[in-house]
Curated annotation (Swiss-Prot):
Belongs to the Cu-Zn superoxide dismutase family. Residues 174-211 are annotated as: Disordered. A lipid is attached at S209 (GPI-anchor amidated serine). The lineage of its organism: Eukaryota, Fungi, Dikarya, Ascomycota, Saccharomycotina. Residues 1-15 form the signal peptide. The keyword Secreted applies. Keywords: Antioxidant, Cell wall, Copper, Glycoprotein, GPI-anchor, Lipoprotein, Membrane, Metal-binding, Oxidoreductase, Secreted, Signal, Virulence, Zinc. Its main location: secreted. Cu cation binds at H75, H77, H93, H153. This is Cell surface superoxide dismutase [Cu-Zn] 4. GO terms for molecular function: copper ion binding; superoxide dismutase activity. Its EC number is 1.15.1.1.
Length: 232
């Protein structure tokens, strides 16, 4: 029991808020292109464009979602869609700041949890546009999403379809011709509606304060690691 408690404390210390990202102004837009497959009718795009304030304007335009299995969460995943076109191989949610799947604030959620911050897809044909203050189009940023992927899930976290996030001029034959996977998301993220998190642009935290909290978490984790070593 003592060691379980220590592990829990360490996990809390390592968790941190994602900093506000305002470094995308003037950067190249990105897009995830979804195409129909033999097992999925989902098609359309999710576009990422630099906003005037340096955050990212996200435009979702998808059709063909299967009836009866919504609402549909969607997330940025940590790996691209491979040549095998298997959505399971995209790994877990993109989470460079050790966010949580159950957090109550946008900054504390996993960075890739777009639907957690802005709401699930709620219909078989769906369009929405919003500003996200945490992901980045800057290749030098820890929050950069280029080269990763997006997975659309059913309400039980089955991976329905996936697409690579590429620049507008990149080919994406491998990126979006993804196969159906009956396995649930490896990160076991629960479905969330729009009341679970507001738009990233409404968060009042600053980039500096986010970075400060991350640094403090690092110091705390190091101290706890020392305590663990002394107890073992």
């Amino acid at each position: 029991m003592k060691y379980l408690s220590i592990i829990s404390i360490v996990a809390l210390a390592l968790a941190g808020d994602s900093p506000i990202s305002t470094d995308s102004k003037g950067k190249a837009p990105l897009v995830a292109r979804f195409k129909k497959t033999s097992k999925s009718d989902i098609e359309g795009t999710i576009k990422f464009e630099p906003a005037n304030n340096g955050t990212v304007l996200v435009s979702v335009d998808l059709t063909g979602l299967p009836s009866g299995v919504g609402p549909y969460p969607y997330h940025v995943h940590e790996k691209p869609v491979p040549e095998s076109k298997n959505c399971t191989a995209t790994g877990m949610h993109f989470n460079p700041f050790n966010g949580s799947t159950t957090a109550k604030t946008p900054a504390a959620l996993e960075l890739g949890d777009l639907s957690g911050r802005h709401g699930n897809i709620t219909s078989e044909s769906f369009e929405v546009e919003y500003d996200d203050s945490y992901i980045s189009l800057n290749k030098d940023s820890k929050a950069y999403i280029g080269g990763l992927s997006i997975v659309v899930h059913s309400n039980n976290n089955t991976r329905l379809n996936c697409a690579n996030i590429t620049t507008l001029d990149e080919g994406d034959d491998t990126a979006s011709a993804a196969t159906w996977s009956n396995s649930s998301s490896s990160s076991s993220s629960s479905s969330k509606n729009s009341t679970n998190g507001s738009s990233g642009s409404s968060t009042s935290a600053s980039q500096g304060s986010g970075a400060g909290r991350a640094e403090i978490s690092g110091f705390l984790a190091a101290g706890i690691a020392g305590v663990v070593a002394a107890l073992i």
